[in-house]
Amino acid sequence: MDLTGAHMLKIHRPSIDHPFGVDLWHLFEQLSIKTIGWNPSEFEYIPGKTPMSQWSSVIVSITAYYVIILSGRAIMTNRKPLKQRRLFQLHNFILTIISGALLALLVEEVFRNYMRNGLFYCVCDSRHFTQRLVTLYYLNYLTKYLELMDTVFLFLKKKPLAFLHCYHHGITALLCFTQLLGRTSVQWGVIGLNLYVHVIMYSYYFLAACGRRVWWKQWVTRVQIIQFVLDLILCYFGTYSHIAFRYFPWLPHVGDCSGSLFAAFFGCGVLSSYLFLFIGFYINTYIKRGAKKNQRKAAGKADNTSVAAAAGSEALAATTATNASPFSARSRKL
């Protein structure tokens, strides 16, 4: 099997169609055909027929996720942690590569459409729900089930299962499903930002699992918060434009944004909850704990100063007493 042929890697001068100087979609297509016999250019998302496109399969999968992690945590209560370091490294490395590849393919397609048709077309026009983008949306959706393994590693290592982590992982799979089903044209922005964050996040986990000291841990959460702010700007704009155009045309708007109202409201609600939860997590983890840590350090320094001062006072008193003794003896002799 030849995976290095010149016909696979087509080099171009950077342009609207090939912003990276390489035809990434062609490369992805050829690799997919040669490795797994699947042509992404022929993919068609059909609700109810495409794998994991039925409400029943999605609900069962997410329910199974919560059952597994809760029962798994209970099973591990009286057992020693299973670190699975190599497997954890591989998991994070794979997700870093997948996220980066999907992000590059997404940028290539969106950039082409943006340069030819403008920003509003990309955000709101139903024609921007292209076959290539739908394929990438679907592949991104499938990765959400792979990401559920994050929690499995947590309970195997007997790490605490925070509500934010479990809620976020389970609901994100449902969120991606509803947006595919609702054909929201704005979802490329949310997915692109999420993929960018995941490149940072999973590369951090990979490096940490390899024993590297990574200084930018806090920035993972900061970038996630920025991501949700930008997500909500896009989603609220799209939802408002759709409602104003369809139901309240007397309100100021710039045109219709395609997608179902259910998908729009569900997306706005979920992303809003993410923003509040991640801000709360950041405050509790880095600000409050940091303040307490500084207080403990200050208290430790104060204790050390007090001990040193007390020791100095005792030494001074002893020295004074020693120096005073001869004069006392002389006075008694006189």
From Swiss-Prot:
It comes from the Eukaryota. InterPro entries: ELO_fam. Residues 73-86, 157-160, 209-224, 282-334 are cytoplasmic. It is an enzyme of class 2 (transferase). GO terms for molecular function: fatty acid elongase activity. It catalyses: a very-long-chain acyl-CoA + malonyl-CoA + H(+) = a very-long-chain 3-oxoacyl-CoA + CO2 + CoA. Residues 1-51, 108-135, 182-187, 246-260 are lumenal. It is a multi-pass membrane protein. The modification Phosphoserine is found at S325. GO terms for cellular component: endoplasmic reticulum; endoplasmic reticulum membrane; nuclear membrane. One of its GO terms (biological process) is sphingolipid biosynthetic process. The keyword Membrane applies. It is found in: Endoplasmic reticulum membrane. Its EC number is 2.3.1.199. The chain crosses the membrane at residues 52-72, 87-107, 136-156, 161-181, 188-208, 225-245, 261-281. Pfam families: ELO. Keywords: Endoplasmic reticulum, Fatty acid biosynthesis, Fatty acid metabolism, Lipid biosynthesis, Lipid metabolism, Membrane, Phosphoprotein, Transferase, Transmembrane, Transmembrane helix. Belongs to the ELO family. May be involved in the synthesis of very long chain fatty acids. This is Putative fatty acid elongase 1. It comes from Schizosaccharomyces pombe (strain 972 / ATCC 24843).
